[in-house]
Amino acid sequence: MTLSTLPLSYCSNVHPGLTVDEVMSGLTEFTLPVREQVGELAAGLWLAQPVIKELLTTDGRLDQFASFLQDHGLTTYTLNAFPYGNFHDARVKENVYLPDWTRDSRVQYTLDCARVLARLLPPEIEWGSLSTVPLGFKEFEHPVDFQDQCAQRLIDLAQSLSRLRDETGRTIRLAIEPEPFCVLETTDETLDFFQRLRKLAADRNLLDEVYDLIGVCYDVCHQAVEFEDVADSLRGLQAAEIAINKVHISCAIRVENPSTNEEARRVLATYAEPRYLHQTMGRSADGTIHRLVDLTKEAALNPDADFAAADEWRIHFHVPVNAESLGPLQTTRPDLKTALETVKTLADCPHLEVETYTWEVLPGAEKPSLIDGLAEEIRATRRLLNNL
């Protein structure tokens, strides 16, 4: 049992790009200079739906893009197929979960991503991965059979991925990414859904395809925000034979003793921003979890009674993974260390990707340049992995 020996990946969703030219420009401007600093590096690509469409419908465009990656020595073995549209819009928030997994557009986009990755995947790499939305956003209205509808679409996708393997010889696996306030957010919810998914797959004689091609993307930040024991969570997924196809190396914000820690709450208020959703959880001494769908300045500065009484808050804000603290704020880096220690013991050998997409919205004038910040994240992650 060991960790993946593939080059460490970092996710390009930190860079905007709604055309192929814009994606290549981001890779040239940021990814290549980061690689110059850190050495071998994989590009975990976020390719929005317009980019995927351009690659598949413009003659020669996909071959041109593949040549660009090869010419620049950039390895790609994973795509982030979670954000469908503009992940750098002025306001993304809950729209990032659209379309959900009942929609034809989500299925088609994901399959198109698989077709692109099958072309980009280097021949020496056995399989590629796609991370995706955890069905949908829990706060939206859904029909009573929503999870069954999603399951049927995922089974359809597994069948299509199996056919793609027959056509191309390339194996592409899906990685469903649980996230706070989504239909799948906790490990228990994920375990329950996979039972449902597999029962329906068996009814369609597609159980083998689902076992092989549908797994999870374990985002350490997300499960830490839920106050889960990440080691137990990972072992529970393995015990249920749910493949961990991808791990997002990520950290969240922690506030200890928030009722008396006014300085931390003042600093936390500066992290409330209009683009991304920052789901917030507070845990009381008796283990009760209090939930807030999005961090606001008011919630940080003047929390309600339940949150004020909590011993600790955790906030879904991806912060640099090399940071143990951010001034008076703490991070969930200890959970990241525990998660990677556990991953090393598992039978699965998931793809490993650093995913800190929030550099543009991080507060503070003293933060490093994006290139230097990403490079330090990669170096810190390598040190962490090497010391396991």
Question: Model-predicted segments: where are they?
Answer:
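N-terminal pre-domain/capping segments
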Residues: 1-128, 152, 159, 208-213, ...
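Flexible, acidic glycine-rich loops studded with aromatic residues
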Residues: 287-388
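Anion (oxyanion) recognition and catalysis
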Residues: 70-73, 238, 317
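Conserved strand-to-helix beginnings and helix N-cap segments that scaffold or border functional pockets
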Residues: 20-24, 55-62, 184-188, 227-231, ...
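A short acidic (Asp/Glu
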Residues: 54-57, 89, 140-142, 185-189, ...
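Active-site acidic/histidine proton-transfer and metal-coordination neighborhood
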Residues: 90-215, 225
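Acidic/histidine-rich catalytic cores of soluble enzymes
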Residues: 161-304, 310, 319
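Active-site beta-loop-alpha junctions enriched in small/polar residues
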Residues: 11-15, 46-50, 81-84, 133-137, ...
